[in-house]
A protein has these predicted regions:
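Short acidic alpha-helical/loop segments enriched in Asp/Glu that coordinate divalent cations
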Residues: 127-133, 173-185
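Active-site scaffold of zinc-dependent metalloenzymes
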Residues: 61-114, 118-128
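Short amphipathic alpha-helical segments and their helix-coil junctions
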Residues: 92-98, 136, 140-147, 226-231
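A metal-dependent hydrolase signature that marks the N-terminal structural subdomain at the beginning
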Residues: 1-77, 257-258
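Post-HEXXH active-site segment of zinc metalloproteases
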Residues: 108-109, 122-157, 161
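Internal, well-ordered alpha/beta segment that forms a basic, Gly-enriched binding/recognition surface
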Residues: 165
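Pan-zinc metallopeptidase signature
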Residues: 179-260
Length: 260
């Protein structure tokens, strides 16, 4: 099910700098959430498993089943929206899993995704947005009022943006000693720039949903791009410092304005 991945020199350098104990393995099959039996197989690789769980009351009554399962005592690795590279600290040592969907992608792009996961895993941050919002997820759900799937998408986007406020400082610092990775970070941002600039018009014309726009804008934060209103309020020290409380307040104000 899992095979150890050989890392390129730039990625190995990032691992040694940020999380030298971290393991990187390829998964045999694609997944959103790793089936529990397969997740348990990680016990053959790592020293210990430490499954996370959260209070059920953090989740609204209409919350998606996948979120309820994540909050339970079921050992859960990976969630919808996590992308092609997944990291977890529910194992000792922590581990990064690479999905086979990345096969055929440009090597430099894959290297950046791996380095990004290593940096994120090294931070003292929750593994998932539920640990970020905690009981405030119910408040976010009430503010967003887009249904379970819409709230999930907005929450994941806001958490991704908050993480980006922390990681982009590290990415920018690579210009001198990990220039290949820094170049991939800049290139990825350049590919997003035009789409981000056109977001207000795309939303106004109904070409992009507000949830999709939030996801794109928040993904641009880690690249240091200029964001249009109302997303620019998320690219601030206030959001970095006040975290989920700021995100909920932003959602409340923003969706109230959209409904006017």
């Amino acid at each position: 099910m899992f095979s150890e991945r050989t890392l390129s020199p730039p990625v190995e350098s990032a691992r040694e700098a940020y999380a030298p104990e971290l393991l990187v393995y390829d998964a045999a099959g694609d997944f959103e959430t790793l089936p529990p039996a397969q997740a348990e197989e990680l016990g053959l690789i790592v020293d210990a498993l430490d499954p996370s769980h959260y209070p059920a009351e953090w989740i609204p009554p209409t919350g998606p089943d996948v979120l309820e399962r994540y909050a339970s005592t079921t050992f859960t690795i990976g969630m919808p929206g996590d992308g092609s590279v997944v990291w977890t600290r529910q194992t000792t040592p922590p581990i990064v899993l690479v999905k086979p969907r990345l096969e055929g992608s440009p090597e430099g792009f894959v290297d950046f995704l791996l380095a990004e996961a290593i940096v994120e895993c090294s931070l003292d941050v929750p593994e998932h947005f539920l640990g970020f919002f905690e009981s405030g997820y119910r408040d976010l759900d009430a503010a967003v009022d887009l249904g379970p799937a819409g709230t999930y998408q907005i929450a994941a986007a806001l958490y991704d943006g908050w993480i980006g406020l922390h990681t982009r400082e590290e990415f920018a610092s690579w210009e001198s000693d990990r220039s290949d990775l820094a170049g991939q970070w800049r290139d990825a941002g350049a590919r997003l720039e035009g789409r981000v600039e056109s977001l207000p018009g795309a939303v106004a014309r109904g070409e992009t949903s507000f949830a999709d726009a939030t996801e794109l804008a928040c993904s641009a934060i880690k690249h240091g791009l200029d964001l249009p209103k109302p997303f620019d309020a998320l690219d601030t020290d206030a959001y970095r410092d006040h975290a989920s409380a700021f995100a909920i307040e932003w959602a409340d104000r923003t969706f109230a304005a959209l409904s006017d």
